[in-house]
């Protein structure tokens, strides 16, 4: 029986979209299953208060782009929709510093910097990475704080995947023919710098995956099936993978479908991929899965805090610019970025409360809830105004704090009283996953003082549950199943026709925004696949790792003379954060 697809990909984010394009170019019949809906530019929410288009909560009739997932040790922000996290991410595309490549989990396998750099460079071109050209009010404030604290020389503008205009110009609102792919891609419109990147770009400036990898894959024959939630999968006796799905949000039997494929790629985002692997293991569908599943789950050692004024300052436009416009490095292992939402997008302000400190040498033994009450009692009216989400985006500088330290949590499933298995977490390998980052709080308090505002954290921090937008790992690369879930070619140990190609395969904390790394790892993984019908040069599982040369696709979509053409060259230093 002929399968529905040669390759079926679950998820359409950075890993899934890269894989879809490159394997379509190699002649495979590719299908992509996406739980979320498809958006045209004008269909994105005008503000984050349009919850049906912004928030992901299918049981409530909300099919937006913003997922929020709670875990015991962390609260997670993620993406949804055709294009995955590219729809609501902050456009920021850094190459990580050296500790990522040298992490003890995988550094002994190969020279990862040497192997991955050509693929980082290719992903940069595909995603249209340029240096942010605008120095905003938030950048000025952050730069002044960095200067005063002695690390002003670390301030840099961010590398972003945004179209500002042709040939390095800024032409806001002007539409031009495809500037990246020699006519194979869509027309693009110059960025308005309205700050609405994370609610969905309505202007055609953000280089989402729909504008590049995924859109090109579809034009070459890949089939994207939206509003399709995967309920389970298993390998049949004939070797094919059978994937059971239901129409997202439906409870009806008639909305169930089954797909078959020779090869199956999990790219459902770290949360989604981990959930599927745990579920299939617990139900006996993947009995040979490595016991390392869930180990080395990372949060990017992250904290999301911020500073807010009590009323809008007419002399400060904190919504101007793309979502993230600059970076500072207060310590060798800490990276802070100012973040913004556009005017009117204030719903995420409901996550904010007053800043509190955790325990430890630089902290306090006072419980965080008590700190909150003490601070609030000093200025009750000011606290109420600070917590009011009205005009929150116009009053707030969000501070995204990341580190490339070796800490992690371990995710696992446990059976509850009703026999239902629950997904949970605990502290993992290395140093404890931070519940707060002291230098992040210090910098944020300085920012608050600069704007005559109040420093804030998130409600989860009162219970030592930080917020992260970068949930990673848990199905990491190892040199055998005792040390990893997947091999260095991204094949799941024990199941060589099952792959993990998304954030779950990130094997160490990055200390920078992860999207470029996910794309680069996916580029490398797909480059090692043979063209359809040719001999697979990857060694069988169980044999020692061999470094292989990338295999050019037989049917490239992008013309060879276009900026985004597939070619492996040294990396552009603009986005090297090392």
From Swiss-Prot:
Compartments reported by the entry: Secreted
Active site: 470 (proton acceptor)
InterPro entries: Cholesterol_Oxidase, FAD/NAD-bd_sf, GMC_OxRdtase_N, GMC_OxRtase_C
GO CC annotation, single: extracellular region
Domain of life from the UniProt record: Bacteria
GO molecular function, one term: cholesterol oxidase activity
Family in the record: Belongs to the GMC oxidoreductase family.
Name recorded for this polypeptide: Cholesterol oxidase
The organism of origin for this protein: Mycobacterium tuberculosis (strain ATCC 25618 / H37Rv)
Lineage: Bacteria, Bacillati, Actinomycetota, Actinomycetes, Mycobacteriales
Gene that encodes the chain: choD
């Amino acid at each position: 029986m002929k399968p529905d697809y040669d390759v079926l990909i679950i998820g359409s984010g950075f890993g899934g979209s890269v894989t879809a394009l490159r394997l379509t170019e190699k002649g495979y019949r590719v299908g992509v299953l996406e739980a979320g809906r498809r958006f045209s530019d004008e269909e994105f929410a005008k503000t984050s208060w349009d919850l049906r288009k912004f928030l992901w909560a299918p049981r409530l009739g909300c099919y937006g782009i913003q997922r929020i997932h709670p875990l015991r040790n962390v609260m997670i922000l993620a993406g949804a929709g055709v294009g995955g996290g590219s729809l609501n991410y902050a456009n920021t595309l850094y190459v990580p510093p050296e500790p990522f490549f040298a992490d003890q989990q995988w550094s002994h396998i190969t020279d990862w910097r040497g192997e991955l750099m050509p693929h980082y460079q290719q992903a940069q071109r595909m995603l249209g990475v340029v240096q942010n050209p605008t120095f905003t009010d938030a950048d000025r404030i952050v730069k002044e704080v960095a200067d005063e604290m002695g690390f002003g020389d670390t301030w840099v503008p961010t590398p972003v995947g945004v179209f500002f205009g042709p040939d390095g110009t800024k032409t806001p609102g002007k539409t031009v023919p495809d500037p990246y792919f020699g006519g194979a891609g869509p027309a693009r419109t110059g960025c308005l710098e309205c700050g609405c990147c994370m609610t969905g770009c309505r202007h055609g400036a953000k280089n989402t995956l729909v504008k590049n990898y995924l859109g090109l894959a579809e034009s070459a024959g890949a089939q994207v099936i939206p509003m399709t939630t995967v309920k389970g999968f298993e390998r049949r006796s004939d070797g094919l993978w059978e994937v059971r799905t239901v129409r997202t949000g439906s409870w009806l039997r008639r909305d169930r479908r089954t797909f078959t494929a020779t090869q199956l790629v999990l790219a459902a985002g770290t949360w989604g991929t981990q959930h599927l692997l745990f579920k299939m293991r617990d139900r006996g569908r993947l009995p040979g899965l490595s016991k390392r599943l869930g180990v080395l789950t990372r949060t990017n050692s992250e904290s999301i805090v911020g500073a807010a004024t009590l009323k809008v300052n007419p002399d400060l436009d904190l919504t101007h610019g793309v979502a993230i416009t600059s970076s500072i490095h207060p310590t060798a292992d800490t990276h802070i970025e100012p973040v913004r939402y556009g005017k009117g997008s204030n719903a995420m302000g409901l996550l904010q409360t007053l800043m509190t400190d955790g325990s430890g040498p630089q902290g306090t033994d006072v419980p965080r809830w008590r700190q909150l009450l003490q601070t609030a009692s000093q200025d009750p009216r000011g606290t109420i105004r600070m917590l009011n989400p009205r005009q929150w985006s116009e009053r707030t500088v969000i501070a995204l704090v990341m580190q490339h330290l070796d800490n992690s949590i371990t995710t696992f499933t446990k059976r509850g009283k009703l026999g239902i298995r629950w997904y949970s977490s605990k502290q993992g390998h290395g140093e404890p996953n931070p519940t707060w980052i002291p230098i992040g709080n210090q910098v944020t308090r300085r920012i608050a003082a600069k704007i005559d505002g109040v420093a804030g954290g998130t409600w989860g921090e009162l219970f030592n549950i930080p917020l992260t937008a970068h949930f990673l790992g848990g199905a990491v690369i190892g040199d055998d199943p005792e040390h990893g879930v997947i091999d260095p070619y991204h094949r799941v140990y024990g199941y060589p026709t099952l792959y993990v190609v998304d954030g779950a395969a990130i094997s160490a904390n990055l200390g920078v925004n992860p999207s470029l790394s996910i794309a680069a790892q996916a580029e490398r993984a797909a480059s090692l696949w043979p063209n359809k019908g040719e001999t697979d040069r990857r060694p069988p599982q169980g044999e020692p790792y061999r470094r292989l040369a990338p295999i050019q696709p037989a049917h490239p979509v992008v013309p060879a003379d276009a900026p985004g053409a597939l070619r492996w060259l040294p990396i552009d230093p603009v986005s090297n954060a090392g």
